[in-house]
Amino acid sequence: MRYRSTRSEEKISAPQALLQGLAKDGGLYVPEMLPVPFIEYNSLKDLSYKELASFVLKRFLTDIPENDLKKLTDAAYTGTFDAKEIVPVKRMTDAFSVAEMFYVRTWAFKDLALSLFPYLLVWA
């Protein structure tokens, strides 16, 4: 998959976007297209956090072989968080669930993304 700047038509690969960070024109890199295949969402509900992360990321980081991506997500999320599930989700009602973010170091979602980012940079 190619990535393009939000301020120009500059296009680069995912590894280049990871390493470069911002585009030369100061824009952000976004996917050239959104990979929105038909997904049976019920098939995702029983995946672990690592499995779900790999499932989503392989659609956006097509330059990374699937086996490598699984190894990267496994390394990033194994032994890093206090909960076995990484982010436990507690069902409050049939229509409402809450992610228990207090199991991550700063109690914020950024811990999830930033745990994987260094592994992606090393791979790139």
Which residues does each PLM region occupy?
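PLP-dependent amino-acid enzyme catalytic core
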Residues: 1-124
